[in-house]
Amino acid sequence: RDRVMDFAKLAEADSMLNTPNCFGIYVAGLTFKWIKAQGGVAALEARNIEKAKLLYDYLDESKLFTGTAQKRDRSRMNVTFVTGDAELDAKFVKEAAAQGLVNLKGHRIVGGMRASIYNAMPVEGVQKLVDFMKQFETEN
């Protein structure tokens, strides 16, 4: 058994083999408190399902934007999509940024767009993105 993981021996010796990552522990504590304040893990899961559904439902009906992941492989956190035209993708990213919708540019090799809708992203943020996508589609 690895000495670092033998907590009984460490406790008996009233010592540690290394100094714990204090800042990491502090940040983890803040994160756990935030999760609790949001209603817990189950509430975050429900919200993440709602956000992903909102965006994927729009992508599934859009005539301009197409999701790049197969339905069975879709991520709740990173939603990737394209217009099918690299110049139009670039225009979308630029105009979205002007509306405060930032960091939507996709991977430098794959291209397209990627909306990262992690836990801290509110449903309202995803709705703002979908509303902008609808407007962009109408205008293009």
Regions found by a protein language model. Give the residues of each.
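Active-site C-terminal subdomain of aminotransferase-like
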Residues: R1-Y56, Q70, E139-N140
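Short amphipathic alpha-helical segments
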Residues: E12, S75-V79, G111-M113
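Hydrophobic alpha-helical scaffolding
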Residues: N18-N21, V82, N119
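Short, well-ordered beta-strand elements within core beta-sheets of diverse protein domains
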Residues: A28, I35-K36, T80-V82, I117
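Generic non-transmembrane alpha-helical segments
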Residues: W34, Y58-S62, K91-G100, F132-E139
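A short linear hydrophobic-aromatic micro-motif
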Residues: L64-T68, G100-G106
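Conserved PLP-binding catalytic core of the aspartate aminotransferase-like
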Residues: F65-A96
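PLP-dependent enzyme catalytic core of the Aspartate aminotransferase-like
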Residues: A98, V110-N140
